């Protein structure tokens, strides 16, 4: 959701996971980076989201985000490193920064040049799909295990 941080998403997680959820795409952190949310808090929030999903037998795909260098070089580097660290820790696929080829491209972005438009959303789906498809194939082929 627009302007939400990883903490906001964590607070809504239980509601988002109601029903027969089998795969979760976690694409969070851009607003954390813009607001200078401490990287350790970002990692804690993302860890809680991933742990909760995995405890319910929900497969997770993690999408890397990047922080603009407005909060200093150390922050930017730590933010960049958080995603591969979490992907390794939880053994989940890591999608490279999905906006990499869209930034500054007016054909892919809304007039604010921050959020993708419909064409940008399709491009994001194209980037994520190779990481998502194997999980969809596995997790939709058999009846789902109880998660609670």
Question: What are the residue ranges of the model-derived segments?
Answer:
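Alpha-helical cap/lid subdomain in secreted, periplasmic
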Residues: 8-148
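A short beta-strand-loop structural module common to alpha/beta enzyme folds
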Residues: 1-5
């Amino acid at each position: 959701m627009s302007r939400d941080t990883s903490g906001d998403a964590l607070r809504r997680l239980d509601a988002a996971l109601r029903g027969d959820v089998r795969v979760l795409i976690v694409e969070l952190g851009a607003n954390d980076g813009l607001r200078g949310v401490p990287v350790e808090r970002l990692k804690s929030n993302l860890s809680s989201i991933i742990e909760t999903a995995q405890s319910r037998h929900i497969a997770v795909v993690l999408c890397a985000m990047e922080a603009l260098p407005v909060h200093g070089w150390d922050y930017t580097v730590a933010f960049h490193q958080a995603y591969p660290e979490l992907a390794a820790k939880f053994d989940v696929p890591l999608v490279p920064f999905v906006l990499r080829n869209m930034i500054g491209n007016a054909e892919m972005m809304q007039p604010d040049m921050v959020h993708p438009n419909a064409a940008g959303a399709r491009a994001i789906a194209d980037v994520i799909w190779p990481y998502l498809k194997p999980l969809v194939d596995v997790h939709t082929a058999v009846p789902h295990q109880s998660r609670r």
